[in-house]
């Protein structure tokens, strides 16, 4: 094993052997911009390795209980969003559950032809376009970012996931945080049954509670929550007038000081609704940076803060 002084002198000697000063500068740039970050990213604490393994096991079990890669069951009533800025619909969109299938899984399914990557704009011709891939669940990587880096220590706190589906956020919160109470509210009974089954199998039912209900009939849970998670929550599942009502319910009942984790940003979620659902974001919430950015790699931090948003309620 080398001492620090030995390594330092060997490095200086190594740098003196480049053919030109330009080569040595290029090497230092690479070291600074890529190699060091990659080394740090690959140096994962043992505790985090264990957590990742646990969440992977939960995801694989959940996947075995779901008949398709979409994570959508036959009793769900999905509706193509009429107010989508991207013009998303059932023809140009592919649904893939990112909790059940990570990037490597998706690549494999695509290569096998099980996930379509294009759609025909005019049947019978070569007029094709790339399909848009969306998910209604957070990936395991994103869950790690949210509960390890984005949010503060949640010991003794209550988390509420609105539209908890198969339970991805609930499981991520259980494994990656010390939250005392983890609530999921979900209107689809099949999803609730599977989430509860998974909780029992992995011994998570002491801290996790899945509520089979619409949000409008369980308003009181909003006032209990210290953290509220809203992940692509309404636009594929409710008509526009109902979306407006639901956002108003959240606006009126989320307690001051609570944190909102949203995908997409609140600006984007409300902009597509009539008159921003009557909500003035400046008076309601304050955007927040990650509480513990040092706990995630810079690459993951840069990637995630552009797609996962945090606010505190004023």
Whereabouts are the PLM-identified features?
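Conserved class I S-adenosyl-L-methionine
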Residues: 155-165
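Conserved alpha-helix/loop element of class I SAM-dependent methyltransferases that forms part
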Residues: 115-120, 133-156
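Conserved SAM-binding loop of SAM-dependent methyltransferases across substrates and taxa
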Residues: 167-179
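Domain-level detector for long C-terminal conserved domains
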Residues: 187-314
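Intrinsically disordered, low-complexity glycine/charged-rich regulatory or linker segments
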Residues: 1-136, 264, 271, 277-279, ...
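Conserved acidic residues
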Residues: 157, 180, 226
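Conserved SAM-binding motif I beta-strand of class I
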Residues: 181-186
């Amino acid at each position: 094993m080398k001492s620090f002084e030995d390594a330092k002198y060997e490095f200086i000697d190594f740098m003196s052997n480049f053919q030109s000063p330009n080569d040595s500068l290029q090497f230092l740039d690479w070291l600074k911009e890529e190699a060091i970050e990659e080394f740090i990213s690959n140096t994962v604490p043992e505790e985090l390795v264990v957590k990742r393994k646990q969440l992977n096991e939960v995801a694989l079990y959940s996947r075995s209980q779901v008949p398709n890669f979409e994570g959508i069951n036959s009793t769900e009533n999905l509706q193509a969003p009429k107010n989508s800025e991207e013009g998303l619909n059932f023809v140009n969109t592919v649904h893939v559950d990112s909790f059940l299938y990570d990037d490597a899984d998706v690549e494999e399914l695509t290569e096998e032809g099980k996930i379509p990557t294009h759609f025909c704009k005019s049947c019978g011709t070569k007029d094709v376009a790339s399909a848009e891939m969306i998910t209604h669940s957070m990936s395991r990587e994103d869950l790690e970012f949210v509960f390890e880096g984005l949010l503060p220590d949640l010991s003794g706190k209550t988390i509420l996931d609105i539209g908890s589906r198969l339970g991805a956020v609930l499981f991520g919160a259980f494994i990656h945080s010390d939250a005392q109470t983890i609530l999921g509210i979900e209107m689809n009974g099949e999803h609730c049954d599977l989430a509860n089954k998974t909780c029992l199998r992995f011994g998570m039912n002491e801290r996790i509670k899945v509520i089979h209900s619409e949000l409008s009939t369980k308003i009181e849970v909003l006032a209990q929550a210290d953290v509220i998670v809203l992940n692509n929550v309404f636009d594929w599942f409710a008509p526009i007038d109902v979306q407006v009502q639901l956002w108003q319910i959240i606006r009126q009942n989320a307690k001051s000081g609570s944190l909102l984790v949203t995908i997409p940003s609140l600006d984007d979620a409300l902009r597509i609704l009539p008159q921003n659902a009557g909500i003035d974001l400046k008076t309601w919430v304050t955007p927040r940076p990650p509480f513990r950015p040092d706990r995630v790699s810079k690459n993951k931090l840069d990637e995630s803060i552009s797609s996962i948003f945090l606010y505190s309620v004023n």
